[in-house]
């Protein structure tokens, strides 16, 4: 996020007509001294994925699966790729909310998981400390930035994604908060954590209680969002066919729909 570009070049990189995002990124002018200016730059994160694939011959998803996802018990992960088959890196990873929580717990535990040291504590500390100042209207986006991690108030750090996806780690409170949502008010979500959850935390660990633990598990198992009923007589078959899109920044050309009885 401090590549030296004066503004985020991601849209230009991702919309390059030939789909060669690496070449488009490397052709950009670098107006500032690298490391001197924070500019949020998803294309730079994509370049990290491209470099890893060049060196290992594996996509970022394939590289992480045996080293991170499998040990954490994360299954079914998918990652979007660019037109040249490189994992997009800065976006497009699909995992469950509880998998996000596992990732945060791994960092909270300084890289240790079920007796394995998946990441070094030194790397955890280095990646999550502030390396550069950032400036933003929203308070939670001007606390500094590490290696792909935002610094937060209350000596916390987080990874986040568009429209309210969060992995927030509070080492001093021994707490991880994982959220998947659809909202434009991401600062409001963060404010809710600080104003509601944080004051409710006890100063020390609760005594172990098998009964209360079982009650908690039962409560968690009962939580679900109800599925909306299907509309009868909707006749979805009328939408079957192939649809061609106009030229767009996402490089999407067409979509096809078919329905089975």
Where are the regions that the model predicts?
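Active-site-adjacent helix/loop patches that line small-molecule binding or acyl-intermediate pockets
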Residues: 1-74, 95-111, 119, 124
């Amino acid at each position: 996020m401090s590549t030296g570009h004066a503004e985020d070049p991601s849209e230009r990189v991702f919309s390059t007509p030939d789909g060669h995002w690496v070449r488009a990124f490397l052709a950009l002018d670098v107006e500032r001294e690298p490391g001197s200016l924070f500019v949020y730059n998803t294309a730079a994160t994509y370049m990290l994925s491209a470099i890893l694939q060049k060196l290992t011959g594996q996509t970022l998803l394939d590289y992480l699966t045996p080293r991170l996802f499998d040990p954490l018990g994360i299954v079914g992960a998918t990652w979007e790729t660019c037109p040249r088959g490189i994992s997009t890196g800065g976006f497009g990873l699909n995992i469950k909310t509880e998998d996000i929580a596992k990732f945060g717990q791994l960092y909270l535990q300084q890289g240790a998981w079920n007796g394995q040291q998946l990441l070094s504590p030194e790397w955890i500390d280095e990646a999550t400390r502030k390396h550069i100042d950032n400036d933003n209207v929203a308070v939670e986006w001007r606390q500094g930035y590490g290696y792909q991690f935002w610094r937060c108030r209350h000596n916390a750090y987080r990874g986040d994604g568009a429209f309210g996806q969060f992995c927030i780690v509070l080492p001093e409170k021994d707490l991880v908060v994982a959220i998947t949502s659809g909202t434009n008010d991401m600062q409001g979500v963060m404010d809710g954590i600080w104003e509601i959850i944080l004051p409710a935390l006890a100063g020390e660990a609760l005594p172990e209680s098998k009964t209360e633990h079982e009650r908690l598990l039962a409560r968690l198992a009962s939580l679900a969002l109800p599925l909306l009923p299907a509309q009868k007589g909707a006749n979805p078959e009328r939408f079957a066919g192939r649809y061609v899109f106009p030229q767009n920044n996402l490089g999407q050309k067409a979509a096809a729909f078919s329905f089975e009885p």
